[in-house]
Amino acid sequence: QDVVHSFLRF
């Protein structure tokens, strides 16, 4: 799981 990419998915 990518937590950093989870909120950086913009």
UniProtKB/Swiss-Prot annotation:
It is found in: Secreted. GO terms for cellular component: extracellular region. One of its GO terms (biological process) is neuropeptide signaling pathway. The modification Phenylalanine amide is found at F10. Keywords: Amidation, Neuropeptide, Pyrrolidone carboxylic acid, Secreted. It comes from the Eukaryota. The modification Pyrrolidone carboxylic acid is found at Q1. Belongs to the FARP (FMRFamide related peptide) family. Increases the force of neurally evoked contractions in the major power-producing flight muscles, the dorsal longitudinal muscles and so is likely to play a role in sustaining or promoting flight behavior patterns. This is FMRFamide-like neuropeptide. It comes from Manduca sexta. The lineage of its organism: Eukaryota, Metazoa, Ecdysozoa, Arthropoda, Hexapoda.
